[in-house]
């Protein structure tokens, strides 16, 4: 892969701008009712850049209102226009915003032009493209073959456009989450937007470094030579995301797909229709030949029968097996982010109150609809009663409003709802076994945080992933028995251990197979971009986050560049005793 990290030459920029003007005048590469307008005013004064809100407008094609930049930037720019003095830090921020907006102005249509589309259609006339989605994939593959996505500057531009869109659609995103999940703005920022923006900012800041070919030292046998490892995009990738974290689990993989130089087919969940609608509007800035959002029922029905170059799927193990079976004939590489029953172990030397607080938060986050949530808790029998009381205390503080005068507690209506109505009945049935220590009531699609005791490994709730606001509590006496038990069941996506003994911690880390986890906390390993996130066995394969998101959507390609001025004759026929002796010495035989 050719390195295109150097700055664009003025002549190349001019050429791109001229091409875009020609395309806009004829309506090429612009979807119906879509329009992106950017006008950046430039002043001749070298000491200042003056920009006003009127000069910086992006109009999303389907959005209800124009995309706006951050208000603070607009105010600073307005002050600059009036001649007020600024600090160097403010001037630097304005300059960065100006550069980004200029990039958006210059940058470039992301799809095929009209003639290329006609040519593509002609070439595929005789191809067996039996489905509407198959035609989209064919167009995307044609666009990928233009090599536009190989340009690092092109990729950076698209990531910056995406960042602006996310900021512009903030209110619509929060509103959609309230409708589909009953999720508050704070939770949307904490569990969705915050993670997306952190990943996006990291990728933009590090893409040039990540994409740069890595030099490797070569052996004496290949003297003289140079070795390189390049990161190649796969081509047309498919991203299928679930309903529990519909924005985060859609956009983070998409960031990797764009950064890696791929085109993308994105299938959000049908169970969160309002969020899916916002995602589609937000991503409408990209041409369908580059990023396509699947929402049509006809396309969804046969989506996994279509040949892709790479698949990133987040969902259930059952559906993952179906996908793997259908894609086996194509030998399609894929990453599967699944789930399972992630255990939480609370040992006798744990800080009981802090452990209960962190377990309760991790378990009932998003109403338990989190793939890495503690599915059940194994508490040492010596501290079981104290742990249960502490857990009940924290459930009350987090999710109930206290009415001291009336001497009662009232469940808060702001708790996240169960998305699928069928799951409400399933969860109610799971609560029929054991002792309900607190909760246990359903209010429509909202189920109160529930604590269950009096259970063992044979109960129904221990045979399937809970994926809801029910926390089963079991007891144990010997950690070694727990480790032996875990070797007999499916490997979990996550595991959490609370305790202080270093020997016990080392046993948990080394003798139990799990995707990832925490010592003395829950969930938080997911938030670290330097820690790879992924499952093992039934809980998934492959990983991502941070640099590994870029690596997930690219493949390593090895290149040996051999010199011409010297040629080692050892490898060529005929063999002599001297050659054999040298070879044995070299290979230490």
Task: State the predicted function of each range.
Residues 3-125:
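Long, intrinsically disordered, low-complexity tracts enriched in Ser/Thr with interspersed Pro
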Residues 68, 114-127, 150-154, 443-589:
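Conserved C-terminal structural/oligomerization subdomain of aldehyde/semialdehyde dehydrogenase
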Residues 92, 111-228:
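N-terminal Rossmann-like NAD(P)+-binding subdomain of aldehyde/semialdehyde dehydrogenases
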Residues 142-148, 239, 344-346, 376-379, ...:
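Short, well-ordered beta-strand elements within core beta-sheets of diverse protein domains
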Residues 148, 163-166, 170, 181, ...:
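Structural signal for hydrophobic packing residues in well-ordered secondary-structure cores
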Residues 155, 200, 261, 291, ...:
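Residue-level signal for inorganic ion chemistry
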Residues 219-354:
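Rossmann-like NAD(P) dinucleotide-binding subdomain of oxidoreductase/dehydrogenase enzymes
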Residues 285-286, 319-457, 519, 587-588:
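ALDH superfamily catalytic-core signature
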